[in-house]
Amino acid sequence: MLAVGCTLLVALLAAPAVALVLGSCRALEVANGTVTSLPGATVTLICPGKEAAGNATIHWVYSGSQSREWTTTGNTLVLRAVQVNDTGHYLCFLDDHLVGTVPLLVDVPPEEPKLSCFRKNPLVNAFCEWHPSSTPSPTTKAVMFAKKINTTNGKSDFQVPCQYSQQLKSFSCEVEILEGDKVYHIVSLCVANSVGSRSSHNVVFQSLKMVQPDPPANLVVSAIPGXPRWLKVSWQDPESWDPSYYLLQFELRYRPVWSKXFTVWPLQVAQHQCVIHDALRGVKHVVQVRGKEEFDIGQWSKWSPEVTGTPWLAEPRTTPAGIPGNPTQVSVEDYDNHEDQYGSSTEATSVLAPVQGSSPIPLPTFLVAGGSLAFGLLLCVFIILRLKKKWKSQAEKESKTTSPPPYPLGPLKPTFLLVPLLTPSGSHNSSGTDNTGSHSCLGVRDPQCPNDNSNRDYLFPR
């Protein structure tokens, strides 16, 4: 079915120009006897009465806003370089007797209309309008010819009357469209008056794809106290949009006043406020918002009018000498504390990451800084490992020099002692009866005991 509709639309657009003429656009008819003319032309008026023929003296009177009179010989009155304000009725008299009336209509032919169609809500009808560059004459009329392309019922032709609004300075026409209707329309605007007519180019639109909301309303940009780089932005749905059945998604864009490049954020559906976190300190910013149907039906609205705002500035601090301090200087701790305080924002004020790069640091600078930091960290780790290894080897060397060796450094040499096997005479008796009070010679290495009698039982068995 869709292929049939597309084929039909292509066939209509590819047809010759004659086949695309939706209706006959002709100049408006005027009453019998009315003389029409363009501005700047020369007009000849003829008194209609028979008695005015010949060389009779005819008195002419203009019945317009300004009273004017002429006297001519004969029944003709010649007006040179007529203007629009010469439009009116011209009365001709013969001997103070009214002979006849000649209507004159001076008009400007209409300019070629440029038709544009839109639909501000999926629940409303479509509107087509044209804004002429100059105010049209009171006799100018407009009508729109339309063809409705229906894949099931063929095509239907109809006309829509258009009204001129003095307040909006435009012609507008309303095309009835049912909710959910996806048919195609081909429309053309015909503008005509008594001296000419012009027709616009054909406009083709699809009922759903042409939906375009009005720009968001009541955009407000304000500073957040204590946040030198934050801006709070809030807005509302346009009055022409009914949020009962269809919601809007939004996009926000902002820039410093001296910049031409915008940073664009996509926002959540039905979100009507957000916080900009990367505004420049003390710099005025331009902010705009636009909207579109939540399921991408139709087109984006136009951007809202520009609204400016400046982030919060710290109050000047007075030094002891009475000189005010820098108002834009804020401590890092205060800024971090404020970020912690506002970091967990509500759903309505949650901020998404910007689509375009919003960091004021250029990419080459960021790469150089990151590479320098990584090189410094690697150098520190290398130095620490070298020092640790050096300290470990030095500690092991000191522990070897201070502690005694666990084993002898060389082979042990036996110690030879000359011990007599026999005790000299008299030695045994001279020891006395009390051995406890005398010196006991039981050790073989004692110099006072040259003889050792501990093994005498070996030599003298009992």
Curated annotation (Swiss-Prot):
Positions glycosylated per UniProt: 32, 55, 85, 150, 218
Cystine crosslinks: 25-190, 47-92, 117-128, 162-173
Topological region Cytoplasmic: 386-462
Span list, region Disordered: 423-462
BP term (GO), one: response to gamma radiation
PROSITE patterns found in the cross-reference section: FN3, HEMATOPO_REC_L_F3, IG_LIKE
Coiled coil residues, start to end: none
Ig-like C2-type domain residues: 20-108
Name this protein carries in UniProt: Interleukin-6 receptor subunit alpha
Organism: Rattus norvegicus
